[in-house]
């Protein structure tokens, strides 16, 4: 049986976003924290808190929406897992993908940590493309 914790996290965020949930709980890991940091920095989620549960911990992610409670609009329009356990996708520094012509971001795991596509281009590094978000 295969398991993909990153795909699970992205799916939980996507599902919570579809039904306008205020928050969603995800089992924690260092990679998931790095991804959540990028989502906060880029304005896709309000924030997250780490909750110690005696095991691996939980990330409680606060979702972000535009507009009033009655006329809400989603901030995250799409979220896609790119590199999967069965098929890893790597890019060099010259082939970093643009998401929705620059309106979205690509999350890339590099030797300098987990970065957005713009940050990876600035640092001049490539790596494994984790996800696209727009």
UniProtKB/Swiss-Prot annotation:
Record GO biological process: translation
GO molecular function: rRNA binding; structural constituent of ribosome
Cellular component per GO, a single term: ribosome
SUPFAM superfamilies: Ribosomal protein S8 (SSF56047)
InterPro entries on file: Ribosomal_uS8, Ribosomal_uS8_CS, Ribosomal_uS8_sf
Keywords assigned: Ribonucleoprotein, Ribosomal protein, RNA-binding, rRNA-binding
Cited Pfam families: Ribosomal_S8
Family per similarity comment: Belongs to the universal ribosomal protein uS8 family.
Oligomer and partners: Part of the 30S ribosomal subunit. Contacts proteins S5 and S12.
Function: One of the primary rRNA binding proteins, it binds directly to 16S rRNA central domain where it helps coordinate assembly of the platform of the 30S subunit.
HAMAP family, alphabetized: Ribosomal_uS8_B
Protein name: Small ribosomal subunit protein uS8
Species: Fervidobacterium nodosum (strain ATCC 35602 / DSM 5306 / Rt17-B1)
Taxon lineage: Bacteria, Thermotogati, Thermotogota, Thermotogae, Thermotogales
Gene: rpsH
């Amino acid at each position: 049986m295969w398991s993909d914790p990153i795909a699970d996290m992205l799916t939980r965020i996507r599902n919570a976003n579809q039904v306008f949930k205020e928050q969603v709980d995800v089992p924690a890991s260092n990679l998931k924290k790095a991804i959540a940091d990028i989502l906060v920095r880029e304005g896709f989620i309000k924030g997250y808190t780490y909750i110690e549960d005696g095991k691996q911990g939980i990330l409680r992610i606060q979702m972000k929406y535009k507009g009033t409670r009655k006329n809400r609009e989603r901030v995250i329009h799409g979220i896609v897992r790119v590199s999967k356990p069965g098929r890893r996708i790597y890019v060099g520094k010259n082939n970093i993908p643009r998401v929705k012509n620059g309106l979205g971001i690509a999350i890339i795991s590099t030797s300098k940590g987990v970065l957005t596509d713009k940050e990876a281009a600035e640092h001049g590094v490539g790596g494994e493309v984790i996800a696209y978000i727009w």
